[in-house]
Amino acid sequence: MANIIRCKLPDGVHRFKPFTVEDYRDFLLVRNDIEHRSPQEQKEIITDLIDDYFGDYPKTWQPFIFLQVFVGSIGKTKSTVTFICPKCKKEKTVPFEIYQKELKDLVFDVANVKIKLKFPSEFYENKAKMITENIHSVQVDEIWYDWKEISESSQIELVDAIEIETLEKILDAMNPINLTLHMSCCNKYIKKYTDIVDVFKLLVNPDEIFTFYQINHTLVKSNYSLNSISKMIPAERGFVLKLIEKDKQ
């Protein structure tokens, strides 16, 4: 199994070790712990969990990195989500694309001028400030100018020229998590996910805890040590389990 996961971040490609089976067990325990906690407590716990793994990176990059490493570790770019159709009340299962290509700086056209924005390195309560503080440069007549070299009046004029539709696209692109779930039954539904807490709760099911230990038990009975199992990545453990089950047929 490959033991490196590549993530494309604003400053280039970074390499990370995949999560192990031991890590995944911890995620299950955390998921179970937050089940009946308040939204604020859930946010704090998941934020701290991710920071423990990727604390050397900006806070805004960490959710993206966590999800990329998680996806690489389980060996799947899609998960499955179950929902209840609001109309017929039937239970439906749909695929959920959880892979994001990269985290990068942004370029948008505003009033015939290209504006380049750095991907934020911190979270902002004030969204307008998040945009103005991260504008890096502007392109006029094929020439790029540093934002700081432009007069304050010109800066204000350019920012004011940003249309609502473009503004919404910029804010959307500044989310480290940006996933879309498509659901279909009697009608079609679309749900956007921009919060790592919501995504974590979808991907890590507390009901998996019993199955998790059951799989470990099966592998131990096939002469794998708990230590070696814990050091596997989840995708690898899944392959081993399939081989064991195939041998029993």
Swiss-Prot record:
Entry keyword set: Chaperone, Late protein, Viral release from host cell, Viral tail assembly
Gene Ontology BP terms: viral tail assembly
Induction: Expressed in the late phase of the viral replicative cycle.
Gene: 51
Pfam families: T4_baseplate
Stated name of the protein: Baseplate hub assembly protein gp51
UniProt superkingdom: Viruses
Organism: Enterobacteria phage T4 (Bacteriophage T4)
Function text: Chaperone that is involved in the formation of the central hub of the baseplate.
